[in-house]
Structure formats: structure tokens, C-alpha cells
């Protein structure tokens, strides 16, 4: 499921630079995550980077957008067409993912 940022966000900005897909941006009142760019860090980390750095734990799974690991790795490959390493890891089914902990 895509991650979203709750209204508890304190606008510290810690999450934005951690996102490998540039899915996080500053919204009108709080930071927001574009679900079309969010891969839950599948292909990059075995955890969601935004969740790991958020001091108020407001980066949460969005229960309205449930996605499989396969969908998320395909999105990561599509978003990073020039990342040969990511493509190799995806093809070999050997990439970091929170689903594989």
C-alpha cells in the first residue's frame, strides 16, 4: 500500500530527501506523498525510508491503496529507467523490500 503523511506532520522536512523516488513534496500545510511515485522503497531499502526518519511517526501505510511487491518493483523500474543495477536486481528477483524481512 502506498504511504501517506498524516495531519500530525510537523513540516520538519526529514522525509523528503530520503525518498528514492522524489515522491515526497511540501504541500500547502504538510508534506505529501504522491502515490503514483511511492514504491514503499521496494527495490531500494528493506524498510520505508520516510517512516524511519519521521520524528512524529506520521508516515503510515495507506489502507485505501493496497499494492503488491510486484507492482511496487515494476513501478520502481519504470521510474528509474536508467538504473541498470535496479533492473538487474529486479530481473533476478533479488532486491531489498519490506516484504522480505
Curated annotation (Swiss-Prot):
Cofactor needs: [4Fe-4S] cluster
Task of the protein: Ferredoxins are iron-sulfur proteins that transfer electrons in a wide variety of metabolic reactions. Fdx2 can receive electrons from both FdR_A and FdR_B ferredoxin reductases, with a preference for FdR_B compared with FdR_A, and transfer the electrons to the cytochrome P450 CYP260A1.
Assigned keywords, A-Z: 4Fe-4S, Electron transport, Iron, Iron-sulfur, Metal-binding, Transport
Record domain 4Fe-4S ferredoxin-type: where: 1-29, 31-64
Binding residues annotated for [4Fe-4S] cluster 2, in chain numbering: 19, 38, 41, 50
GO molecular function: 4 iron, 4 sulfur cluster binding; metal ion binding
Binding site for [4Fe-4S] cluster 1: 9, 12, 15, 54
Domain of life per record: Bacteria
InterPro entries, alphabetized: 4Fe4S_Fe-S-bd, 4Fe4S_Fe_S_CS, YfhL-like
Pfam families: Fer4
Cofactor note text: Binds 2 [4Fe-4S] clusters.
Protein name: Ferredoxin Fdx2
